């Protein structure tokens, strides 16, 4: 009875080995074939597991009028480029060096107590935290709101304070927890960043799924001011200037993947002989090319993962694919310095010469791995930036 191809074999079909070049797409000379529906599903499931995702995210489609770039995705795309530059040896960015995961949250509900109400005036924002993953430690959290220049009053000092709404009450003021205070001029323009990291312990310990933030504005002489008159924009602002929250996480441990069934290994039976091979027949010493004629020595080869070909560009923002690479080649004695061989690999190769049926050759394997970053939408339309460690082969060697 014919066996159905396993997921690892199908994964190999999704990853295209290249002859050379480092473009965003593999060259047309790369061997490819169209996968069947069942193969495609198995392959997608396997790669999702590698990416640490339980399933394929399915973000809600945006109406045509709302498809102009929004503030959170634009900011997260800048973070993605900064994280990519950091992985390539660029200057480290604030919070990014310690973060494995960055999540943005869009303001879901907004309430105001402004003109016509009793003072103090305030603006309140609410965020849905149901998508925060378990087992992640918060390293930093920020609230970002855009400020336009204000002439009411002209060129005066403003104090912007942020509080967490701990508990709401129907007959009295809500219980608040102070988070941050920023001082600026009324004529300033740009993104105002408020540190809300202190609120993260409450989310994680109490498993709160709704975060309320309240913002107050005061003048230098202590008078309460309508945040809108101070130039602070809310949900009615253009999409590229709407407020949002960003949280940086670091995984407490590597995600555990579900084990796959594996066939038991068959032990090779050694040949019964008391004679050593003839000296001129020792594999690897006198042959050109270190081993089987025509075989290349251990080195790195290119391997490309295409999210476009997987049909995932409806939720993957960047990249469209990436070069993962793989290691392949001979590790036959003598092992040159270019093979990055370990002392154990050299010893194993020597013993293999004497007893090739008992001790195998050293293996060509990665000696250095690096991370790759993926920016995508989750099923709640939050934008996620996740750094996946040990996903790209940087160097190969004999082990």
Swiss-Prot record:
Phenotype seen when the gene is deleted: Deletion mutant mice show normal embryonic and postnatal development. Homozygous mutant females have normal fertility. Males do not show germ cell defects during the initiation of spermatogenesis. However, germ cell degeneration is observed in about half of adult males.
Keyword Glycoprotein on entry: yes
Record GO terms (molecular function): cytokine activity; growth factor activity
Free-text tissue specificity from the UniProt record: Expressed in testis. expressed in trophoblast cells of the labyrinthine region of the placenta and in the inner root sheath of hair follicles of early postnatal skin. Expressed predominantly in the neonatal mouse spermatogonia.
Pfam families noted in UniProt: TGF_beta, TGFb_propeptide
Keyword list, A-Z: Chondrogenesis, Cytokine, Developmental protein, Differentiation, Disulfide bond, Glycoprotein, Growth factor, Osteogenesis, Secreted, Signal
Subunit note: Homodimer; disulfide-linked.
UniProt-recorded name of the protein: Bone morphogenetic protein 8A
């Amino acid at each position: 009875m014919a066996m159905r191809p396993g997921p690892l074999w199908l994964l190999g079909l999704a990853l295209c080995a290249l002859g050379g070049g480092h473009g965003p797409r593999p060259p047309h000379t790369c061997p490819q074939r169209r996968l069947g529906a069942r193969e495609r599903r198995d392959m997608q499931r396997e790669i999702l597991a590698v990416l640490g995702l339980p399933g394929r995210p399915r973000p809600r489609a945006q109406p045509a009028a709302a498809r102009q770039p929004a503030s959170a995705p634009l900011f997260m795309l800048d973070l993605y480029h900064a994280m990519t530059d950091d992985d390539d040896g660029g200057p480290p960015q604030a919070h990014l060096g310690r973060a494995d995961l960055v999540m943005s949250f869009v303001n879901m509900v907004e309430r105001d107590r402004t003109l016509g109400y009793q003072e103090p005036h305030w603006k309140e924002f609410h965020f849905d935290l149901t998508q925060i993953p378990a087992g992640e430690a918060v390293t930093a959290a920020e609230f970002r709101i855009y400020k336009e220049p204000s002439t009411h009053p002209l060129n005066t000092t403003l104090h912007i304070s942020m509080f967490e709404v701990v508990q709401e009450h129907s007959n009295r003021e809500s219980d608040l927890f102070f988070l941050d205070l920023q001082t600026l001029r009324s004529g300033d323009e740009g993104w105002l960043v408020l540190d809300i990291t202190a609120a993260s312990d409450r989310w994680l310990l109490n498993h709160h799924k709704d975060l309320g933030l309240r913002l107050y504005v005061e003048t230098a002489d202590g008078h309460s001011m309508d945040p809108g008159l101070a130039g602070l924009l809310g949900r009615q602002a253009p999409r590229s200037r709407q407020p949002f929250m960003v949280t940086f996480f670091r995984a407490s441990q590597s995600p555990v993947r579900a084990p796959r069934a594996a066939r038991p290994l068959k032990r090779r039976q050694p040949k019964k002989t008391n004679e050593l091979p003839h000296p001129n027949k020792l594999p690897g010493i006198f042959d050109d090319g270190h081993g089987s004629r025509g075989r290349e020595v251990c080195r790195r080869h290119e391997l490309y993962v295409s999210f476009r070909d997987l049909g995932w560009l409806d939720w993957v923002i960047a990249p469209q694919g990436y070069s993962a690479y793989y290691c392949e080649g001979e590790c036959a004695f003598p092992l040159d310095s270019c093979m990055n061989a370990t002392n154990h690999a050299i010893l194993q190769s020597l013993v293999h010469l004497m007893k090739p049926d008992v001790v195998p050759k050293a293996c060509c394997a990665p000696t250095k791995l690096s991370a790759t970053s993926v920016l995508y939408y989750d099923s709640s339309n939050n934008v996620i930036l996740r750094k996946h460690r040990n996903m790209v082969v940087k160097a190969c060697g004999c082990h």
